[in-house]
Amino acid sequence: MLRHSLRWFLRFVLVAVIIPIVLGAAISYARGWPESWRNARWESSGLLPQARDVPEALVMVIAARTGRWKSIFAEHTAIVLKPEGASDWTRYDVVGWGSPVRRNAYAADALWYGN
């Protein structure tokens, strides 16, 4: 009974965990990774409307793939705020463990290194 349960558990882990990770890695590799974060595109992706065209207050969490092999497992997230009636978005994000929160280092909906 235990042996049968262990066999089913291992099959589940293979199908639910291992195969998706391997497929994700293969797809990411096939698409190609940027050579360096210094050469990456950082401009606006065009996903957000102009802040002045949105009268209400908004809080958004945006995410983009990280660079190279980390993109298999991780995304970079940023919080984007717009107070009611404001004419600009405000973006907050952290790059690197223990680093301070950055404010408006890039466009609110900027592409990230892994994009």
Stretch-by-stretch model annotation:
Residues L10-S28:
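Hydrophobic membrane-insertion alpha-helices, especially the h-region
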